[in-house]
């Protein structure tokens, strides 16, 4: 009997996302319920954005939640390497195999040619897609250009007529027309694979039997299925999970909700409660009880109990459930966990250098630095009263800084300050006009330790969370203001 093998394959390009944890949980439970194995693979082919720091944060977040893996980059295994960036030769081999079989081809089109192609198609009211012009090149010309070392990608051929039947474990058979599919790039000019080729090759070579992934990948499923057919491989069983949603039903995003697992750990949520809540996202226990452990979820796991309605990720409901878990702890364990959370040595070492020179007794630490240990802060609205800026301008400055911080890839003090300075300079203000607002929003106080140091230590999600709280305290941003300020954002360097 074939051993069930599932996997999670996150990209290490930022803080570990609750959506990653959600999909990891369901893959883990499915594998364990069937006596199988759960694998962790790292999709780090985006060399510009991928970092080992983000990779480690993924490991730490999943282990904090209680999700572990039998094979992965940090523990090894018989199917390694488990980082896609270390599997380049493997992808090159299989891409060339597709070319040799006539299922893929080199494409030498430049970015400018592709942009012009799309513009012409849009002008005609057509769906932008690759027009296949490289297929018209003779074998001799292709070889000449390859021999000359001309930059190129490898694209897959796709049918232009008919439909692809996608067998989904939740929805049954889903028909998707082939004319919606583009001639997907499989290998980029830098010699690294795109998601599609790497995904199929890795899942096959690692013996993955079932793939549970987010439903946002369902429209592109025909490309994956076609690749399995081209290679002559058995494809894994496919399951497209409903996406997590904000309370307004929009896709869960950091613009509306904190999305980092690290944020919830720092806020003092219990990992058991977090897993419990993620387990209730579109799934329920047979007896419908709300509070259950990871092992209880594994023991009772059945995909037939997954609901296709978009599950709502609501922090208030998560907080309520966390309260149930907290109150059920023996008081000794409650005290022990509180100590572990509040007096985390690594976190304390980040804070101590900024506090030590500002206090004369330990009792002065709490008033000065207590905001480091809080989730949100409750600043007095008077702290946002400004001699120079109107209330609307105060909100504008804070909103623009928040948006700039949302696009920040590397969370470092200098880059944080760069975001603030960019907004201030564009609005022809001084730093002294904006920094008191940041102090109030981030620390809840008129002054404290360096606010940019504090933002770096607190991290991106907690910083953005507090800025959003401050904006709500000041009345929020109207739809009209949001539209106008977003236009302004585009012109800020």
Curated annotation (Swiss-Prot):
Motif 'HIGH' region extends across 10-20
Mention any Pfam family matching this sequence: Anticodon_2
Any idea which positions bind ATP?
Answer: 254
Task: Tell me the SUPFAM superfamilies matching this sequence.
Answer: An anticodon-binding domain of class I aminoacyl-tRNA synthetases, Nucleotidylyl transferase
Give any single GO term for biological process: glutamyl-tRNA aminoacylation
Q: Which GO terms describe its cellular component?
A: cytosol
Q: Which GO terms describe its molecular function?
A: ATP binding; glutamate-tRNA ligase activity; tRNA binding; zinc ion binding
Catalytic reaction annotation:
tRNA(Glu) + L-glutamate + ATP = L-glutamyl-tRNA(Glu) + AMP + diphosphate
The places in or outside the cell where this protein is found are: Cytoplasm
The primary location reported for this protein is: cytoplasm
Keywords, comma-separated and alphabetical: Aminoacyl-tRNA synthetase, ATP-binding, Cytoplasm, Ligase, Nucleotide-binding, Protein biosynthesis
Q: EC number(s) in its UniProt entry? A: 6.1.1.17
Q: Does the keyword Nucleotide-binding apply?
A: yes
* Motif 'KMSKS' region mapped to chain: 251-255
Please tell me which top-level EC class this enzyme sits in: ligase
Which purpose does this protein serve, as stated in its record?
Catalyzes the attachment of glutamate to tRNA(Glu) in a two-step reaction: glutamate is first activated by ATP to form Glu-AMP and then transferred to the acceptor end of tRNA(Glu).
> Per the similarity annotation, which family is this?
Belongs to the class-I aminoacyl-tRNA synthetase family. Glutamate--tRNA ligase type 1 subfamily.
- Share what the entry says about its subunit structure, partners included: Monomer.
**Can you say what this protein is called?**
Glutamate--tRNA ligase
What organism, scientifically named, is this protein from?
Pseudomonas syringae pv. syringae (strain B728a)
């Amino acid at each position: 009997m074939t051993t069930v093998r599932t996997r999670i394959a996150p990209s290490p390009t930022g803080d570990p996302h609750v959506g990653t944890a959600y999909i990891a949980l369901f893959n883990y439970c499915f594998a364990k319920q069937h006596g199988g194995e759960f694998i962790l693979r790292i999709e780090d082919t985006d060399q510009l954005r991928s970092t080992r720091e983000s990779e480690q944060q993924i490991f730490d977040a999943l282990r904090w939640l209680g999700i572990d893996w039998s094979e992965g980059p940090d523990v090894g295994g018989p199917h390694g390497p488990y980082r896609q960036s270390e599997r380049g030769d493997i992808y090159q081999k299989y891409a060339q195999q597709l070319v040799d079989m006539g299922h893929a081809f080199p494409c030498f089109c430049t970015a400018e040619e592709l942009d012009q192609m799309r513009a012409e198609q849009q002008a005609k009211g057509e769906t932008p897609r690759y027009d296949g012009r490289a297929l018209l090149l003779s074998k001799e010309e292709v070889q000449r250009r390859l021999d000359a070392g001309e930059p190129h990608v490898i694209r897959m051929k796709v049918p232009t007529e008919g439909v692809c039947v996608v067998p989904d474990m939740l929805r049954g058979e889903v028909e998707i027309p082939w004319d919606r599919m583009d001639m997907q790039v499989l290998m980029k000019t830098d010699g690294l694979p795109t998601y599609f080729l790497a995904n199929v090759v890795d899942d096959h070579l690692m013996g993955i039997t079932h793939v549970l992934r987010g439903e946002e990948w369902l429209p592109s499923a025909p490309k994956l299925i076609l690749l399995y057919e081209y290679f002559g491989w058995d494809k894994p069983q496919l399951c497209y999970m409903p996406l997590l949603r904000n309370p307004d039903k929009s896709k869960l995003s950091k613009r509306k909700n904190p999305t980092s697992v690290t944020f919830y750990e720092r806020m003092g949520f219990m990992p058991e409660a977090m897993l419990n809540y993620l387990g209730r996202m579109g799934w329920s226990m047979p007896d419908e009880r709300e509070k259950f452990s990871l092992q209880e979820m594994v023991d009772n796991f059945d995909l037939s109990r997954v609901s296709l309605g978009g599950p709502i990720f609501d922090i208030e409901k998560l907080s309520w459930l966390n309260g149930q878990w907290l109150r059920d702890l023996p008081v000794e364990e409650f005290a022990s966990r509180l100590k572990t959370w509040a007096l985390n040595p690594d976190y304390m070492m980040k804070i101590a250098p900024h506090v030590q020179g500002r206090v004369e007794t330990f009792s002065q630490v709490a008033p000065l630095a207590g905001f480091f240990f809080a989730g949100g802060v409750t600043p007095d609205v008077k702290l946002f009263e400004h001699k120079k800026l109107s209330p609307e301008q105060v909100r504008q400055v804070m909103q623009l800084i928040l948006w700039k911080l949302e696009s920040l890839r590397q969370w470092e003090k200098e880059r944080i300050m760069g975001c603030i300075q960019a907004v201030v300079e564009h609005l022809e203000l001084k730093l002294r006009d904006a920094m008191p607002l940041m102090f109030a929003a981030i620390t809840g106080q008129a002054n404290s330790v360096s606010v940019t140091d504090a933002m770096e230590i607190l991290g991106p999600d907690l910083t953005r969370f507090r800025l959003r709280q401050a904006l709500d305290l000041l009345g929020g941003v109207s739809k009209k203001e949001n539209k106008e300020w977003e236009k302004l954002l585009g012109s800020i360097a």
